[in-house]
Amino acid sequence: MSRGFVKEGDQEETPIVTPRAVLPDGTPNYVTPTGLELLKQERETLVSEQEANKDNRIQYNYLTAKILQIDERINSAEIVDNANKNNGEIRFGAWVTYLNGQNQKQTIRIVGVDEADAVHGKISFLSPLAKAL
């Protein structure tokens, strides 16, 4: 259709959606049981926000895109539950205490990319530190 027949107000803006944490192609989407629950809770929150924004097309489309992103992560999730396997091995889901460069003890947990939160001591299994351990 020629632009001459299109009203200015008919043009929908494409929402810019920030990508989720990087998960390289071919890398399994490992998640802890807690991580999967957090993804599901995030999805529920987004769906509620989407319902509340039915009249705001731009916000509605933005939330739809976010829901599609999270659905992709939930559908590709591979649950790894090592929480009760405390045999001294460093593995996905394990809490690890180590001495940092300043000889201070630090405790971290190795988790999936979406659950990673350095402030709370949770690092991605893809991080250099997790790989080094």
Task: Map each language-model feature to its residues.
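Helix-rich terminal scaffold detector
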Residues: 1-73
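A short linear-motif detector with a strong N-terminal bias
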Residues: 8-10, 16-17, 24, 74-77, ...
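Homeobox/homeodomain signature
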Residues: 13, 20-21, 64, 69, ...
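Broad hydrophobic/π-residue packing in well-ordered secondary structure
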Residues: 36, 76, 108-111
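Non-DNA-binding regulatory cores of transcription-related proteins
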Residues: 81-133
